[in-house]
Amino acid sequence: MSEDIFDAIIVGAGLAGSVAALVLAREGAQVLVIERGNSAGAKNVTGGRLYAHSLERIIPGFADQAPIERMITHEKLAFMTDNGAMTIDYCNGEDASASQVSYSVLRSKFDAWLMEQAEEAGAQLITGIRVDNVVQRDGKVVGVEADGDILEAKVVILADGVNSLLAEKLGMTKRVEASHVAVGVKELIELPKLVIEDRFQLQGNEGAACLFAGAPTDGLMGGGFLYTNETTLSLGLVCGLHHLKDAKKSVPQMLEDFKQHPAVAPLIAGGKLVEYAAHVVPEAGMNMQPELVGDGVLIAGDAAGMCMNLGFTIRGMDLAISAGEAAAKTVLSAMKRDDFSKQSLGEYRQHLDEGPMRDMRMYQKLPAFLDNPRMFTAYPEMAVNIARDLFTVDGSAPVPMRKKILRHAKKVGFINLMKDGLKGVTVL
């Protein structure tokens, strides 16, 4: 092949794309990354939690040099009604290994740093350019068309986000279904470092991750989130796109009401809004995955549906990193064989099965389980009402605790409780 042909062209400088570029460049591959934003991370929106295990494997001790915000040591899961909340609070005071922890991050900073690591290893980055088409020759992907220029490569890695038009043009995926994605909105609220630590009972670089179900999305599938950064809070909500047709409020109004909730307002009081962003995020996991491998092409990251909403936590960044690493390993093996056919690149699935797909397969039925209106209406209301009755003393004749609980459980329906409980046991 000509010297003008790259070993790999990667579309998208998010986590999957940057990691793929880093791993490839370390082995001497000629890599070009094309990012439509003005910088790596400019187009990325996330709540902001990175589970460290996948990147720790690639860059040991990365937290010592990367622009992380806080190490998550406090977990809060709240069930909310319009005026109340019942919260499960967990604090981890034990020492954990570098691969067991998680961090709050700001993607604009973190992605830029990660791409810098790839560039230092030898990868090339072009920003502010949109890839319009994938170039094919005799049914095989041989490059991309960007800004009117044809750039050739032995293999193309598509890491261009949840709504990958390039994968759609190749026929590797269908147009994204509304039931497979959610609309996410996020505000970045600035507060003094010591104020954040005082309000969330943190010390040093400790951080908190908070998830909220019920009222934030007005009873629709989704939820609210809050992550503590060093001097800011990442606050927002995510709502299933196909449920918005039934919404009585707009998503911006949901966010405003969420901010005014008595369980949230004191946490953000006095804060200054410094950033607002909205984005479409994958929600269906394996149920929305495209064909991941083609002749001369691989798909990774959000474009490959690498996201898991487990209810009690949300994962996406660590899966994207693992997918980027898997894509790079696959390309390196293909380079040794000088074979970039679909069959040769099929090794990608094996690498994924040993990493992110293993986790995603275990929870692949969970999205359907969570797509149950009782999860965001009846159950939060039941939890809050039970807590209210347990903690209220008004001088009236005492009622046995079991009767208080049964009274509210009856409103949900014992058959519904049994049915949902059994289904939950089978999917978790």
Swiss-Prot record:
InterPro entries: FAD-bd, FAD/NAD-bd_sf, FixC-like. Its cofactor is FAD. One of its GO terms (molecular function) is oxidoreductase activity. It comes from the Bacteria. Coiled coil: none annotated. Transmembrane segments: none annotated. Keywords: Electron transport, FAD, Flavoprotein, Oxidoreductase, Transport. Gene3D superfamilies: FAD/NAD(P)-binding domain (3.50.50.60). Could be part of an electron transfer system required for anaerobic carnitine reduction. NCBIfam families: PRK10015.1, PRK10157.1. Belongs to the ETF-QO/FixC family. This is Protein FixC. It comes from Salmonella typhimurium (strain LT2 / SGSC1412 / ATCC 700720).
